[in-house]
C-alpha cells in the first residue's frame, strides 16, 4: 500500500505572496482546512493557511513566500501520510489502493489491472488495461467485490453489462 496519498495537484500560484492554487483530488475539500502538514515532492511542509476559490483550494505553505518560489511547485502533488488521511466510510477506498488491483469477473476470468480511476459526475470509472482496455463503471450492479488486502476487484461478467 502507498505510504502517501495524493489529495491535490498544484496547478498555479495565487497572488504575489507565494500561495499555491490546488486542484483538489478528494471527495471533501473541507478536509484541507484541517491540514497542518503536507508533503510536496517528498518534502514535509507546514500549512499556514487555507482558503477556497470556487472549486479550487488556495494554500499558504511555510517557506514559500514569493511567486518565484511558488512557481517551482507547479504541477506537483500535495500528499499526506496515510495515517494522517481522513478515515473513509465502509465501502469507500483511496484511489491509490484501487490502482494496480487485478480485475476478474465472477467466472474467474482475468481482465487486467486498474490503471487509472476516472472521476465523472455520476460515478467513478475504472480504466483497466489487459488484453483489451476496459472502462468499468463503478456501480453496485457491476462491481461485486473490492478486496484491497488482496488487490483484487471482482465484477459481473462483461457480456452481462456491456453491449458490444
UniProtKB/Swiss-Prot annotation:
* Cellular component per GO, a single term: ribosome
Q: Which GO terms describe its biological process?
A: ribosomal small subunit biogenesis; rRNA processing
Mention any Pfam family matching this sequence. Answer: RimM
- Cell location: Cytoplasm
Is NAD there in the keyword field? no
Q: Name one GO molecular function term.
A: ribosome binding
PRC barrel domain mapped to chain residues: 90-161
Q: Which UniProt keywords apply?
A: Chaperone, Cytoplasm, Ribosome biogenesis, rRNA processing
Instruction: Spell out the Gene3D superfamilies in the cross-references.
Output: PRC-barrel domain, RimM
* Domain of life per record: Bacteria
Function as written in the Swiss-Prot or TrEMBL entry: An accessory protein needed during the final step in the assembly of 30S ribosomal subunit, possibly for assembly of the head region. Essential for efficient processing of 16S rRNA. May be needed both before and after RbfA during the maturation of 16S rRNA. It has affinity for free ribosomal 30S subunits but not for 70S ribosomes.
Name assigned to this protein: Ribosome maturation factor RimM
Q: Which organism is it from?
A: Clostridium tetani (strain Massachusetts / E88)
